[in-house]
Amino acid sequence: MNESEAVKQAYDVVIHMDEPRYWYFLLASVLAGFVVVQAFQKLTGASKERALRNMGIFMVAVNLVPPLYGLLNPDVDLNIHRNLPVHFCGINGWLVALNCFWKNQKVFTFSAFLGTIGGVHALLTPQLTIGDAPVILTHYYFNHTAIVVIPIIMARAYGFRFPKWGWIWTYVAAAVLSTSVGVFNWYLNTYHPADVTANYMYMWEAPKVDNPFVQDMAWPWYILPLHAALLLHLVVINFCYRWGTPLESLVGKSWAVRRFT
């Protein structure tokens, strides 16, 4: 293995199902998420608002862990090709944190759809793009659990709902954003090459995880199945949220309209 391959391997760490830590972290994440959702269901009034603010403060601190760890640890090389929070999960980590204060409907819609997709797949098929140091590993599971759980809390405890056709709006936003990030990857890798490539949102090369939605195809063709999978996931998540937290304006409409629009 040459030096470049060693650097790349140190960044892209895949945790496989045959590793004990895979199951420890997965089960702990599911249990923690369930407990937090149930705890918020029992809160009312000022205590509920205070809990949401505290959760926002906590998540801001969680999002600051990777850059602070890189700045304070002399063994870590902060790299613009990997350390910027412009993966979907990194963006949604900040959005769910800030939306604890903003309570913005569009931010909720975007982060609930894409945070759920990214968070669930990250927990089931983890790939740590900046290595698996204990601090980074812990941050990975905190962040990806939070981007699934916090939107559920916002919907169940604070009354947020998906707007009609919100899943289509989210797909368009995700397509535009990921394409822009793909151009950013190209710029970094072409004009500022480094030992490790910029692969934000996996728009430069496919993820390395064993996932049925990730096909062994050349760029850019592997992106097409990912877009198809994105649409499928958006429809399924919209169905689940509409079932658990129905939209009042659609009461009395047909079953298909209530679940899929």
Q: Which role fits each region the language model picked out?
A:
Residues 84-85, 138-149:
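Membrane-interface loop-to-helix entry segments
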Residues 22-28, 77-89, 109-112:
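Structural signature of hydrophobic alpha-helical transmembrane segments
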Residues 12-30, 167-171, 175, 188, ...:
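Membrane-interface transmembrane-helix boundary segments in multi-pass integral membrane proteins
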Residues 32-38, 96, 147-167, 178-179:
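Alpha-helical transmembrane segments in multipass membrane proteins, preferentially the mid-helix core
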Residues 71-80, 101-106, 126-139:
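Membrane-interface helix caps and helix-loop-helix hairpins in membrane proteins
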Residues 40-53, 101-107, 157-168:
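Membrane-interface helix-boundary motifs at transmembrane edges
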Residues 48-100:
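A glycine-rich, hydrophobic loop/mini-helix early in the fold
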Residues 59-68, 115-126, 174-183:
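Aromatic-anchored segments of alpha-helical transmembrane domains
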